[in-house]
Each structure stands twice: as C-alpha cells, then as structure tokens.
Amino acid sequence: MNDPQPRKVMLISGARKGIGRFLTEHYLAQGWHVVGCSRGPTDLQHDYYRHAQTDVANEDDVVKTIGEVRKVEGRLDALLNNAGVASMNHFLLTPARTAEAIMRTNYLGTFLLSREGAKLMRGNGGGRIINFSSIGVPLKLEGEAAYNASKAAIGELSQILARELAPFSITVNVVGPTPIATDLIRNVPKASMERLLKRQAIPRFGAFADVANVTDFYLRPESCFITGQTIYLGGVS
C-alpha cells in the first residue's frame, strides 16, 4: 500500500508533534498523501500534506474533518489513531475530570475517527485502521489506572471493529509502544520510568522508528489477512 501510484491517502491524528509528526514525515517520504490533525496548527509544509485543526473527542470536529477528506481527496486508505493524552497519578488522587479527559481523547477520539473513517474506506474498497495502545496495559502499571483503562478500551474496541469491518476489507490492528522521549512522558519522574523499563523484556526506551516498523507491517499489502492483533514493543517480561 506504500506505492504512490495510484494515489493513497492517510489520516494521522496527533500529527503536530512526537510520534504523529514522525509518522507523518515518514509516510510523506514514501509518497502518501497525508492529512494530519491536531488541536493546534502545524509548521509542516509539503505538497502532499494538509492539516486540520481537530479535537478528536468532539464529534462535530471529527465529522467535519472526515467530510473534508471525502470532498478534497475522495478516498481514505489508512487511518492512524495516534492522538493521546496521559497522566500518572495514584488512583486515589486522580480527579474525575482527569480520568474523563483521558478517556475522551484516547478512547472516544479513536472511536469517532474509526467510525467516520471506516465509512469513507468502505466506499473505496477497504483500508487499514491502526490504533495506539501502550505497553502499560499488559504490564498493569501502578499510577496509570486512568491512562491504561483508556488504552485497554482501545484494544477491546479494535478487536470488535476487526470483526465488524472485515466484510468491507478494512483491517483493524493495534501497536503498543514503550515509553518514547516525547512530551507525553516529559513530566514523568525518572525513577518511575526506570521501574517501567526494567519490566520490559528489552529494557530500553523506544524510538520513533520502532513504531514505524510496526505500522509499516500493518500497511503492507501482504498484511491483508491480519486483523484484530496487537503488537507490543519491548516485550512483556
């Protein structure tokens, strides 16, 4: 699916920085036409790139964004639901507003973009949806009750969508990154990060290229028979 002839269109949420920015540039370099979305503007300029300021947890925003993709591009071949927020805190000290904000962005945002994106994919003969979980889910990390719950929900959602969307030739798979040096973990105490890394089978920080390796795999034409799967980076020790 990485052959730019015929033109292939991808939407990446959370595209302004971090993993999303890396993946945007990665797939632009492969000839994809990429629509990136985030709540803020971007400085990325490329002939094959368009940016939409979108709150993925806002249904009207998502419907509008996918509507623009339909109008301008006429198709959607791949959706990478990368947008996410995180907060580490003991369960007893986590405000309801924090838990709600995490669930809305991480889970509801994935739900809404997948729903609207799949409608467009269905019209052009299929596509690939790649959702983002976290190594924290299988590791059951203390201090991440709200965050891990949102990511676990994404895993369950993805398995059901894999079944419901299979008749339309749409695959739905998940990548679960390890901690990567992005804004998402910048304020996490160093000791907490070290404890997390020690619980991985391969105890190191992840790299953007590690994530791209998995998304590349899911996007390969030969991966059309793979759906409902999760690949966790770093391994679970």
Residue ranges with predicted function:
Residues 16-17:
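Conserved glycine-rich cofactor-binding loop
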Residues 90-91, 95-100, 185, 196:
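Substrate-binding pocket helix/loop in short-chain dehydrogenase/reductase
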Residues 92, 139-145, 167, 203, ...:
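Active-site loop immediately N-terminal to the catalytic Tyr-X3-Lys motif
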Residues 114, 150, 158:
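Active-site helix of classical SDR
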Residues 119, 163-167, 224:
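Alpha-helical segment proximal to the catalytic Tyr-Lys
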Residues 126, 204-233:
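C-terminal substrate-recognition "lid" of short-chain dehydrogenase/reductases
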Residues 134:
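Residue(s) in the substrate-gating loop at a strand-loop-helix junction
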